[in-house]
Amino acid sequence: EWEPVQNGGSSYYMVPRIWA
């Protein structure tokens, strides 16, 4: 499962849930 992570401003990137 992938979830969005805030990357500074209004942008974001997707990362595997296992990283969190």
From Swiss-Prot:
Belongs to the protease inhibitor I3 (leguminous Kunitz-type inhibitor) family. GO terms for biological process: defense response to fungus; killing of cells of another organism. One of its GO terms (molecular function) is serine-type endopeptidase inhibitor activity. This is Antifungal protein. Keywords: Antimicrobial, Fungicide, Protease inhibitor, Serine protease inhibitor. It comes from the Eukaryota. The keyword Transferase does not apply. The keyword Hydrolase does not apply. Inhibits soybean trypsin. Has antifungal activity against R.cerealis, A.brassicae and A.niger, and weak antifungal activity against F.oxysporum.
